[in-house]
Amino acid sequence: MNIKMLSAFLIGIILLSAVTACAAPGSQVATPTFLALPTSTLFIGTPPTAAQIPGTPVAYPNPATICGAPQVTAMIDSFKKAILTSDGPLLSTLVSPARGMDVAFYRDGTVITYKPEHAKFLFETTFEVDWGAEPGSGAMKRGSFHDVVVPELVRIFNQPYTLHCNELKHGGATYELEWPYQSEFYSIHFPGTPANGNLDWQTWVMGIEYVSGRPYVYALIQFFWEP
């Protein structure tokens, strides 16, 4: 054995002795532990979003007026048909593809934004949202679009209503009516009944905008008499 081989052999013995001396008697070599990471849930589509109103008005380009346009009145008729017949596919073709459709059951309640893909299933889904506090009682209103919004739309479409372009038509209010957008709209107004002093008036205001030359609904807000 030459000197180089002997030196390497001795160095190996010394290193092995040092490692053995550092290990505590009876100790075991620790194995690495891998933490389980939470897995994300894949959602098919995204749920509608919620916000408070009135918010800061946002300007959207709208080169053509909607007042008196045959396309617009035909679109309102199609919306009415979709509501009265629970036709989700038809409703989805009327929702603005640019920004969806904001829906507020109360004028100062929560705004729920539905995209066209949401609107297709609004007559079927049981997805519940908080619509805000009921005027007067302060009770919170919670429920699906089908259970909360649709009955009130059906009610006004089944009564003698009138259409008013870019006018917040009402039958007398204890508050100031405001339209929190800078785009155009139509008021769908029921004047109420004399038997109730016309205090049962109701107005659904429908925001309408043109996208690629076609009119679409971008907002729906309900107004009525409040104590």
Label each region the model flagged.
Residues 48-77, 92-227:
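C-terminal-biased regions
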Residues 78-91:
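Short helix-adjacent coil turns
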